[in-house]
Structure formats: structure tokens, C-alpha cells
Swiss-Prot record:
<feature type="domain" description="S1 motif">
    <location>
        <begin position="621"/>
        <end position="689"/>
    </location>
</feature>
<keyword id="KW-0548">Nucleotidyltransferase</keyword>
<dbReference type="InterPro" id="IPR003029">
    <property type="entry name" value="S1_domain"/>
</dbReference>
<dbReference type="Pfam" id="PF03726">
    <property type="entry name" value="PNPase"/>
</dbReference>
<dbReference type="GO" id="GO:0000175">
    <property type="term" value="F:3'-5'-RNA exonuclease activity"/>
</dbReference>
<dbReference type="Pfam" id="PF03725">
    <property type="entry name" value="RNase_PH_C"/>
</dbReference>
<dbReference type="InterPro" id="IPR012162">
    <property type="entry name" value="PNPase"/>
</dbReference>
<keyword id="KW-0479">Metal-binding</keyword>
<dbReference type="InterPro" id="IPR001247">
    <property type="entry name" value="ExoRNase_PH_dom1"/>
</dbReference>
<keyword id="KW-0460">Magnesium</keyword>
<dbReference type="InterPro" id="IPR036345">
    <property type="entry name" value="ExoRNase_PH_dom2_sf"/>
</dbReference>
<dbReference type="InterPro" id="IPR004087">
    <property type="entry name" value="KH_dom"/>
</dbReference>
<comment type="similarity">
    <text>Belongs to the polyribonucleotide nucleotidyltransferase family.</text>
</comment>
<dbReference type="InterPro" id="IPR012340">
    <property type="entry name" value="NA-bd_OB-fold"/>
</dbReference>
<dbReference type="GO" id="GO:0006402">
    <property type="term" value="P:mRNA catabolic process"/>
</dbReference>
<dbReference type="InterPro" id="IPR015847">
    <property type="entry name" value="ExoRNase_PH_dom2"/>
</dbReference>
<dbReference type="Pfam" id="PF00575">
    <property type="entry name" value="S1"/>
</dbReference>
Amino acid sequence: MTFETIFVTLEEGKTLVFETGKIARQANGAVLARMQETWVFSSVCAANLEEPVDFLPLRVDYQEKFSSIGKTLGGFIKREGRPTEREILTSRLIDRSMRPSLPNRLMQDVQVLSYVWSYDGVTLPDPIAICGVSAALAISDIPQISVVAGVRVGFVNNSWVVNPTKAEMDVSRMELVLAGTENAILMIEGHCDFLTEEQVIEAIEFGHKHIATICRAIKDLQQKVGKKKNSDAIVPLPEEVQSSVNTFVEGKFADLLKIKEKKAFEAASKQLEKEIVEKFLEENEIFTALNIKTAFKQAKSDYMRALIREQSVRSDGRAITTIRPISIDTSFLPRTHGSCLFTRGETQTVAVCTLGSEAMAQRYEDLNGEGLAKFYLQYFFPPFSVGEVGRIGSPGRREIGHGKLAEKALSHTLPDPAKFPYTIRIESNITESNGSSSMASVCGGCLALMDAGVPIKTPIAGIAMGLILDNDHVTILSDISGLEDYLGDMDFKVAGNTEGITAFQMDIKVEGITPTIMQAALAQAKAGRQHILDIMKEALAAPKTDLSQYAPRIETMQIKPNKIATVIGPGGKQIRQIIEEAGVQIDINDSGLVSISASSPQAIEKAKSMIEGLVGEVEVGKIYEGRVTSIVPFGAFVEILPGKEGLCHISEFSKQRIENVGDFVKQGDILAVKLLSINEKGQYKLSHKATLSE
């Protein structure tokens, strides 16, 4: 293969470079994509399937090598293993960007591998990975409908920025990753700080201009070194099979769609499919089980589309903008800190909010270093939620992706950590699913936060929008069901309040989605959110004013950073003593912010008093409860703060004359003393007598 390099300038100082022909020459396609000193290598390989399948077997694995930043993993095992959450989310971004660009009925097993080989800590690698994978696909012999590219868009100082640096992202009000072809958008994912629908559209249009530029460069690379596409890998569905199935099911879908309950509908649909397979199977060689099932799915999709297009009626009988019935039960679980049973149609979640100290925070490590997440949402999708038997174990990619979307949606409404110093964990337990369980997680999670007494800024709701695009006829659907997601052209999830958007995610199965269509979808989503928010406010108008009796109490105090070692003590001895004596949990960060959590306010006050005693500075004129450390003929030495000891002269014990100090106090006694002065040697003059009149 010929070595080739292509340069694409997006903005000043941001040039994307594609190289091929030097590395991994036995792969179907391989590209090294780089910007600045962030380099991402991507490869694609395909193998013919032994047995045809009715789905696209695309597998994407993205990995961030720690060697890319000159580090080696700690611990006994030194090689990268189980993917991190960030790697899984990036793998999903690449998959969702590439899948629409691959043809239906592609009978090849396609594997995408993408590795971060060099990371400069400035240029974020995920949009580079999307572009690198697309370029590798473009120059390979794997069939592809169209070339794809991806970018990240930020909103910094009221200006749109393409592929913002890490520093820019830290202050950006939006994070948007989008992918598309030269003429259309295929995938978007992002979150923002209550930006308007108009601003989101503006960001998408801004990003798409740069996507088009990158797509043209990838096409240039394809023309120079691209392999001939393997058209034999695409096995189209014979028209005879489709027409025969269409004729057989004519009139049967009307009866099928009278069944509104999901499980009953699926059972009847499978029975009808079975009848079709039994009738046509082996009628001739083109009537395979796979072909018949594919034709049945297409016929079902065509009928659903025609029903919407011609009668404005959906498969479950709803109108285009109708949202399924919603029921809400807050404080659903008696011993949790906050909970909510949220049901929308046949989609349901039990959302739970748990409050804790910093020790409960989620710790993680990636190429940008170690981090601590004090808010996180975990999404659980057990097989019983769809009436199936399945594997239970570590979360799948879908669970992680859905949880992160709901987490981002709610993160923008959380209170200032300085005013509410709790770690917040939400779990969304999906107990029923028929479309849009991630948006149910947003609604249920928000209500669980409010039920727990978290003083959120504003309630947040989420809704999933769908699209039926037939030539020039466009229909936008509110609150799509699982069937509409499966057979429709778009899944557009939007979360926020009535004033702005906090998170969004869109996947498109067809080209032709224009900014006008997206604008209409966002406007319809806003009306849907308003409807859902009104119902949520009826159930719980505002966050509860008091925390649950079962939630820990947390208070913070600030100490000087140079006093941290004093509080911790040698080998942690001092802080362990405070924790044991007061019955609290203590966390101290590098800035000296001390977080104290306990089940009672009294325990917190005791711990604060002990810490203040360790780090406090002595003040002339202040009264201290000191401990008598030793007695001498002329008085007693009293420790007023740890390590700070002064003399209370015999004349300062009482207003009456005393002959023997030992008759007045004993070693170890607690004695109230007032600090009268500090001499030039730093010695403390104490008086018990001065406290008697106060």
C-alpha cells in the first residue's frame, strides 16, 4: 500500500492529519489520525459470516494506552484490561457514528479497534478516533454508504469552539460530540448548562460545517489509496420475498395493532412471523428463514409508517404528540434517603437517591489523571424488565451509556457543593421497559433527589422523540415506544426544564435530517417536557426541606493547609482518635476543607471541637478549658490547646490567698483559665481567678 498523508485545518492551530500505508498494512483499512501530539491509531477488519444474520455484527473497541502519557499501570498487572467507563462511552460514540454508514444486509463481521498511542493532555482524543475509524473504513474494501466524520463543539466565552482543548472544556457551557456525512447529521451526544433550543441547533450547524470539511478530506484520501469495495458482501433481499410476504400479511396488521399490551403484541407478532416462515420456507432457495423474517420486519415498518402518514395514528393508538400516562409514587421505599416509582406507559423505574460523605464518592483514573465523582447515576436493566431470561453481571455498554446520559442531564441542576457537601448516588432500577427508559431515569432520578431533600435548582424531565421520514413527508413523534424506536428513523432524547436543555442524544438511521427538522423536534420535545414537569410538580412541588432521618449529617470546616498534618497526626493516629471518640467520618482535601459526617449533630460538634483544639491559634483574653499537666510550688502548668502549655501562678488561682496549689487542683484536672498575655519568649500567662467573675 502506498504511504499517504492528508492535512485538514479546522481552526488556527488545529490541524487534523491522516496517515496510512505505513502501519498495519494487512488490515482491511488502517489510519493514524493525529492533532498536535494526540495520536490515535484505528484499524478495521472484516470476515465473511458463516451463517447470515439479521443484524450488523459491528464491534468497536477503543482503548486509551497509559503509555501514551508516559505512565504504567500501578499494581501487579501492568497491561490494560477491562475497559474504563470513558473507553466504553467512546466506543459507543464510534459505533453509533459508523453503524448508519454501513449498508443493510452486509454479511460481514466487522471489527474496529482504536488505540490512543500518544496524548498531550490538551487535545481530546475521541473526535480524532471517530474520524480515524471513518477514514480506515473509507480506504478499506468494506462496503460503506457514505464517509463520516466527527467533531466536538464547546461554548466558551459565548463563542462556539471546534474540538476545544481540555482547558477550554473545563469552562465550556456545552459539550457536544456530533458525527455525520458531508450533507447530514447521523449522531449527536452532549450536555449543556440550560442552553436554549436555538443555541443547540446553532452548535450543531457550526459543528457540521467542520464535519463536511473533514469528510471531503477523507474522500480525497479514499480516491488516492482506497481499495475497491467488496460489493459481494452485500446480499440484498429478493423482491419476490418481500412482495410475497406483503401479500400474505395484508389486512393482518390491523388486527395485530389492536393489541396494546407489549408482551401480548410481541407474542402475537412472533406467532404471525412463525406462520409466514412455515408457509414460505423452502418454497425455493431464496425463501430462507432470514429473508422471510427480514421481509416481515419491513412489512411491519411499512404498515406503521403508512398508518402515521395517512391517519396520524400511531401503532399503540396514540396521536402524534400524545405522551403515555404517567404515575408517580415518591417516598416509595421506607428506609432509603429518597426514592420514587416513576411509570410512563409500560416503562418504569424505581429510582433511589443515597447521600453520603466523600468516602462514598466514585474514584476513577484516566489519561487526565485521578478523579473523584461526588455525583453519579447508575442504571440497571435486568432481563425481567422486558420479560426475558438473561445474564446478570457487570453492566453492559448500553447500561453505562444510558446511565451517563441521565447523569449528565441531572448534573446541571445540583446545588453548590460548598452549600450541600454530600456525595450523591442515584440508582435507576428499570423494572419495565417499552421505550425511553433513560429518560424515565431522568424523571425518576430528579424526583428521588427532591424526595431526599437535595436542594436542586430546578426540576428536570426527559423525553424521547421519534421520526418517520418518507420522501418529503416528515412526522415527529413524542415519547416513542420500543416499537417506534425499532422501526422508526430517529431516536432523539432531550432533557431539561422549560427554560433550557441539559442533555441530549440523537441517533439517525437515514440521511436527510435537516436543521429545520431538528428544530421542530426540539420544539415538540419542549412541549412534552412541560407536560411531564407539570405532572412531576403535582407529585412533589419542591425538594423536601429536611433530609431523611436515615441520611447522615455532614458539615464542613476550613483549616489552614499547613495544619492538615497536625489533624492527621503521625501515621494517622490523631485523626483515628477523633473518628473513634466522636463516632464520625472525616475527609480532608488538599485545600484544608474538612468534611465531617455522622448520624447525629452532637457527634459532629464533638469532632469539630477536637479539630479546633488541634489547629486553633491561642488568643489573648480567651477562656480555655485546659488540662493540668503538672504542679509546681509556685503554680500549675495547664495545656490549653494540644502542644500549647502555660503557667497559672499560685496567685492567679483564687481571689483568696492559698498556700498549696495541690490543695486546689490535681494533675489531670480540667481547669478553666484565661490567657492574660504572651511574653517575648512565647510563654503563656494564665489565670483561673480571672474566669471566676465571668
